[in-house]
Amino acid sequence: MAIKDGDFVKLSYTGSANGMVFDTTDEDAAKKANIHTPSALYGPIVVCVGQKHVITGLDEELVGKDAGTEADVTVLPEKAFGERDPKKVQSYAKSKFPEKPVRGQRVNVGEEGEGTIVDVIGARVIVDFNSPLAGQTLVYHYKVEEVITDPLDEFKGLIRLYAGKEMEVALADGKATVTLPPGINYDRRWLLWRGRILHEGFELVNGINEIVLVETFKKPEKKDA
């Protein structure tokens, strides 16, 4: 059956720009491209088609395909990271930066967010807040590994997608119970995306009416004097 908006699929992909890989679900490909992150969780991801869990051009490409489809798709800037916007290149006083600014360095600048230092001219620092991939045409090689229909697997996939972690989940009588790993509330990624996970669990996964997050604390063992 052809994939449609709202379907969950397990997806593998590798994205490249000008022949250089910038993103992939394949750990070996990441190592080969020198973009490997040891702490990252590699392997196929679960996405809900139409929800922009991947860039627009790849998301739209999945509609009408079948499980097992493997293909390449060319994605133009308007359906990838957009065109470059000159207004997103800003100048700041060097004194605004706590450390010596260096060309190519990624920095966070207040409400503007994260950008790249593109030049340092005297006492001024030029920061580009465009995505490094803005204005570029991308190529994705992808494979639809399978269509997911089990609500439990759909919800577990959302958690993995946003939190970057596998978590123990049980689903019964409309209640999803998530056992949180120790120390999760110190994880910035979890704190950032927890609300989104809950929202999409209710909105996108059929049959979930209640979500319970279980966090267990243990009394520290006393050391012998």
Model-flagged regions — what are they?
Residues M1-A225:
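FKBP-type peptidyl-prolyl cis-trans isomerases
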